[in-house]
Amino acid sequence: MGVCESSNDQNKNAGNNIYDSTNQYHADNTNRSQRKRNSLVLNNDVIISDIHKNPETTYEKVKKLGTGAYGEVWLLRHKLTGKEYAMKIIEKSPYSDEKHIINEINILKTLDHPNILKILEFHISQNKIYIITDYCPEGELFDEIIKKKIFTEDEASFIIYQILQAVRYCHDMGIIHRDIKPENIMISHRENNGLLHVKLIDFGTSKLFSKGDKHKTFVGSSYYIPPEVIKKQYGEECDVWSVGVVMYILLCGKPPFNGEDDDDIFHAISIGKYDTSSEVFQKLSNNAKDLLNKLLMYNQSERITAKDALSHPWFNTEEFQTLYRTHTLNKNSVKIMMNNLEYYKSNNIIKCAALAYLVHQNMNNMECIKASNLFIDIDLNKDGKLEKNELISAYMKYSDLDINQATKKADAVFLNIDTDFNGFIEREEFIRACINPNIFTSPNNLLSAFNFFDLDGDGKISVDEVVSKFFQSSKNKNEESKLLLKKMFEQIDVNGDGFISFEEFSSMIKGIISS
């Protein structure tokens, strides 16, 4: 994660001084490695944090979206920006599973994928837990299934491909979801042709795992659990089975394993044979039947992985790829974004964090969506993050460079964009590097970002508040990091009074993007 600071006297003709000159990237590898060792880390622990106050001071409740066993879900509107979000409010009690709720927060903070619900911020008070996330106005996939009954293969493949991408990403991150079902798949928006964009939600029962781990806790929802969960000896393959159940329901209009009660359902799952004789099933394409067979493979060790499922022939057709690419990449826009990547720089981490917060709060902005679409296009293996070879391919494709030129650019860009130093470029890292942040500098957006740092709400930012923000990442908790932050703070505190005023903060943001 991270956002760049401009050079004052170079690249004036770009009209966006947030980017540094290409000379930055001709420094030798030793200097780059040294820069990484001496840099602060900007990751989601910094950007997504406990706001230490009742969210109703920042957001207004619009309407109640639902009520569950332990709390409520509300539609919110940001008082400054007017943007809409969802908020889950959980009452702390002996009956609410606080451990699972904290687990969900911690896992969501690590995830950055277009098909996974994004957490924006949270607050843990004495009596309640508040979680603020994206708002998906179209509701649950479950409700769509009730209305529609049966989906066409085009409609179903579009949904299943997205879910598999989310599952593959989670598994790569060492996370098992353990409760994939239509109620935990939200519809974010619809295409004009009716195709649904979806996001996976509810990570309360998810769990970190290592390859080969076997888990014994009985977790999940009756229709969607695989045989090995019933036997209490399962791994990440359980998620793939659940995706298979969702796929069967979409295509056939009923669960593959049914019964009068849970015992009947578990018995049917334990046998593992689903109905293939119905007229609806018989009309499915051979590719659809084959993928269902692989997803619902009884033996978990023989079950297809989410990664391999994404390459299945059901998705690997020209018709599907045309269907899935609902966005069109404008050649000129792509050229500008790829060019912006080259000038990306992050030498004042406080400025980076301010702009990172603005982007995180504005991911539904059209420019962010364009950049996200480019990210998806560059992500050739669909694992939700960019590797260096994918960036090299992108430069060869979009900038007409040979492999040596593309490698040189990718090497330099990669080091500057990967400011959490995990060896990959995540979606938001990429987006922040290739868009013009000028789109986020309305007075209300600036005040929202200012308030992100102004923890006590006194109208000024202290160095201790900045340190507190960055120390939320354990990787920054050291004296060297504190000294670096103080030096960067002094660069922004123009009048030297020991605080950053809103005027100084606004000048910082506007100054680094002015031509």
Describe the function of each predicted region.
Residues I159-I160:
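Activation segment signature within eukaryotic-like protein kinase domains
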